[in-house]
């Protein structure tokens, strides 16, 4: 992210991605932090104030519902989608007791979020999809299906610090290999 860009953090709570974006952009530009749960937005506002960040505004709403005023407006759109959380099970062991039905409904929600988020990306802009799970059903299968339906997007490589290094546009981080939580990230560029 660069100073002066417009960024939409579609599933923003608790705000860490928005704060990181603001720092990367030197607090110059516009970051809209959106979340379904209005009560969580107060924490983002408080965090931004505590950090002295003025580029962040908040907006409550369902990321699956189209907002015409945001159409093709953002240089970067972040979708850190609700997921099973299986990548962070060592930190939150109660995850293992979630209903199995969630594993079938989550990809539907994730796909709807991604499809709607795509409408907000300006030509030449970037759409980033991430989850804290390691399940292909919530990760590669969601982004593969999205790209099959959206020819105006393609994966775009990115670089992370070693030991990861260069990627070809998507990556699953594994606790046993990378010393991190389990995590998936896919970067897609709009042509």
Give, region by region, the residue ranges found by the protein language model.
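S-adenosylmethionine
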Residues: 1-191
């Amino acid at each position: 992210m660069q100073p002066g860009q417009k960024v939409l953090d579609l599933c923003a709570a608790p705000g860490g991605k928005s704060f990181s974006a603001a720092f990367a952009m030197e607090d110059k530009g516009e970051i809209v932090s959106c979340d379904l749960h209005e009560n969580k937005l107060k924490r983002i506002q408080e965090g931004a104030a505590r950090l002295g960040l003025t580029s962040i505004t908040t907006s409550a709403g369902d990321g699956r519902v189209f907002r015409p005023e945001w159409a093709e407006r953002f240089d970067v759109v972040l979708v850190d989608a609700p997921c099973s959380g299986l990548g962070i099970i060592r930190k939150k062991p109660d995850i293992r007791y979630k209903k199995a039905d969630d594993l079938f409904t989550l990809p539907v929600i994730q796909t709807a979020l991604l499809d709607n988020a795509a409408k907000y990306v300006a030509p030449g802009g970037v759409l980033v999809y991430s989850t804290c799970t390691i399940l292909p059903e919530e990760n590669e299968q969601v982004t593969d299906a999205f790209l099959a339906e959206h020819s105006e997007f393609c994966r775009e490589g990115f670089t992370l610090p070693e030991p990861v290094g260069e990627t070809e546009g998507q990556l699953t981080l594994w606790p046993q290999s990378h010393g991190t939580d389990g995590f998936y990230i896919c970067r897609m560029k709009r042509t």
